[in-house]
Amino acid sequence: LHFLTSTLYIQFPKFLNVLYSKISKITNFRAIFSMLVLFISRLTHLIKKVPRYDILSKKTLKVDEKYYLTDHGFRQATGCPITQDIERILENIVYIELLSRGYEVKVGKIKDKEINFIAKKEKDLSYYQISYKIRDEKTRERIYETYNSVTDNFPKYVLSMDHSNFSQDGIIHKNIIDFLLEDEGVK
């Protein structure tokens, strides 16, 4: 489980390379493939594959999916300190919350940038960028810059652990804890 949680957030081809290096002592390709199929089939309740969506072409891509744990407790059970990979942990928590609110969730791609989540429910669509802290001006610029190429008028959110309001240019900043405590979904 520790191996899974420490490599979960990388794209699938990289995941396969890491997995292959762990079992490379086995020389029979069929045996490796069978083990991999069995391994992945057993994980379907622990992890969810999230497709990548190209915002400009409005198409779901068939590559570069991301994987998220379905329950944050799985990571905690490995004994990993919460300070290790805090942004990934926060991203996973927001993913679980969006699912619990009934959203279909995809990872956004726009040009060479990534938007952590595109959340869609019926005709409602929202964009989410997750960061641990954005007090630093350069960090804030990097996070907000991702939205520059998104030309539609759907809500764009930046979620962080900061309590100060860093909303700007129509992009709404929220504290992650406040977001998680909202009653009626996104407000």
List each language-model region with its residue ranges.
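Short conserved micro-motifs at the rims of enzyme active sites and ligand-binding pockets
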Residues: G79-P81, T139-R140, D169, G185-V186
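A broadly conserved detector of short glycine/acidic/proline-rich loop/turn motifs that flank catalytic sites
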Residues: Y53, G73-F74, K123, S131-Y132, ...
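Accessory nucleic acid-recognition modules appended to NTPase machines
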Residues: L1-L125
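Short, surface-exposed amphipathic charged segments that create phosphate/polyanion-binding patches used
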Residues: D64, I171-K174, V186-K187
